Amino acid sequence: MSRPLTGALAHGFLGKSPIWYKVVICLFLVLNPLLLVTIGPVATGWALVLEFIFTLAMALKCYPLMPGGLLLIEALLLQMTTPQALYEELQHNFPVILLLMFMVAGIHFMKELLLFLFSRILLGVRSKAILALLFCVLSAFLSAFLDALTVTAVIISAAVGFYAVYHRVASGANPREDSALESDQQVAHLHREDLDQFRAFLRSLLMHGAVGTALGGVCTLVGEPQNLLIGHEMGWHFVDFFLKVAPVSLPVLGAGLVTCVLLEKVRLFGYGTLMPEPVRRVLTAYAAEDDAARTQAQRIALWVQGLAALILIICLGLHVAEVGLIGLMVIVLITAFTGITDEHRLGRAFQDAMPFTSLLVVFFAVVAVIHQQQLFSPLINWVLALPAEQQPGMLYLANGLLSAISDNVFVATIYITEVKQAFLDGSMSREHFETLAVAINTGTNLPSVATPNGQAAFLFLLTSAIAPLIRLSYGRMVWMALPYTVVMGGLGWWAVTYWL
């Protein structure tokens, strides 16, 4: 093979990922067959799980679907699991795939309504503590019924829009014309301090909103993908799920909202910055122009989206159908009554969800390997050997630590499957099984706010267009999430241990 061709192949492998990352993935692929031959399938299975967790932790270097997919293709070739076992896992978890395919796309068509709500709140409330609380509450409420990724996307859209308007004004450009938002070279010296303060203001609001999605997402069956997965295993419907997790989720929700207000009052961990008055004047004038230019068709679209949201909440509460099918109904209702009939416009609604849906299939392949090699059986047996009152707390901690560095859907899938198998084997009562299921659900949802790796909404925020504009880095996100991690994670553990 010629050198130019070899170089092109090496350059194309995993795209723009760092060279060291490409080398590590290649080493994994070479090492696994050697491990299988020398030390057996169980140790190789553990190596595969750790390698996959590595790809999740390094999600900012390369989306985990590609390296994780390569590892799992190799696992299938090495017969560490079978295509039939993977297919059975997918069949078993089909409701979760439906959720990601149709519910996320359905909420995409409500973006105008959600953007309208967040914009009104941002400009209508002057108290920063109340504003932060409203962002957190609204994000929590919406995430309890909708999709956390979509709610985060809407908040990001509002933030990008407002940032762009002021950045253009500060640069002497027309606020309605495109300009380079990444560069501050054209920003007048007079406006630089206000722009930096506005960045800090947006950072704090976005973090409050992202945490809100976790606070609300843990409460209901559809709040997070892993909730539906756990609810499906337990046979819980929407109301059942809410009532089962309420002893943990509701106290944590209250504590999280109190933390939100306190952080704004004490101005620690990067919170408490106010919106500069010159920025408020510019944005208010811009919003007034937008309102005046809104057409009758746009107003009708907002009403249609609002009615569809009400129907969605009612259908979820009554469990009239699988969650994903309700999402498909929302797509049909909104598009039919707002005139969205173009195939390409419909297709854009599915773009956000399909990469993660594909990654979920890889998750289930890892779970199939874990099942076939019985990797987690010793750990589950150790937990179940503890006194019954200690088991929920230990499962919560085990889930929380792993979810902080890995993906919480992956972690929840592993633990709920293993615990259910122990229940089916007669190792526990149904009541205790339900307690452990709540511990797994809250353990994957609450402590995972510690890093962007654990919560999909956090990772989405970190990799979005707004993050570099407002100087929101990985380290800064971890620092700003720290007080929430301590409060939510700590109280969640206490509630699981003593209140269930």
From Swiss-Prot:
Catalysed transformations (reactions): 2 Na(+)(in) + 3 H(+)(out) = 2 Na(+)(out) + 3 H(+)(in)
Record-level GO cellular component terms: plasma membrane
Subcellular location: Cell inner membrane
Pfam families according to UniProt: NhaB
Keyword Cell inner membrane listed: yes
Domain of life from the UniProt record: Bacteria
InterPro entries assigned: Na+/H+_antiporter_NhaB (IPR004671)
Function: Na(+)/H(+) antiporter that extrudes sodium in exchange for external protons.
Name of this protein: Na(+)/H(+) antiporter NhaB
Gene that specifies this protein: nhaB
